[in-house]
Amino acid sequence: MARKRQQQQKRPISSSITKRRVMLFGIIAIIAAGIGAYGYKSMIPVNGKAPAFGFPANHFIKATSSANSGYFYVSQSSGSVRGLRGSGGGGGIVNPTYTFQKGNLQSIHVINEDYNTHSHHNFNIDAFNVHTKDLGYFETQTMTFVPNKTGTFEYYCSIHPEMKGNIIVEGE
């Protein structure tokens, strides 16, 4: 009996347990690498090649329409927000003009709230390679970019040309 116990104690760890541990470690490593790659890619602005570390300025804009005014963008920020100019009625500024500083990270959050017509809308700034997909009713998309040149640039909806405004980028 004592001999059997000694033999059992000297046996190497089962190879199936070792294989399972190695496979589990490999799966965890692959998942961690995938999450890391996704996180790295999500930090790259649409007009950049390297990740931008820091917090962007956030701008909220909704696409909508009315029977009287047609299609338009409305800011979701109050008029006192730095970087926002324009005039308009309702709950925000209609087709607002945004003012950014060159080199500062910006995020534009677009939502289609066109309840009246349920039309698709998009948001484009060609100068900075900012293009959303065609958004259906109540769909959203966020685009993060760095304004890397000064001047006045137009943003617009390619589906409804009357939906447009300006972005002014000032020097550093």
Across the structure, where does each feature detected by a protein language model lie?
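Extracytoplasmic copper-binding redox domains, predominantly the cupredoxin/blue-copper superfamily
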Residues: A2-E172
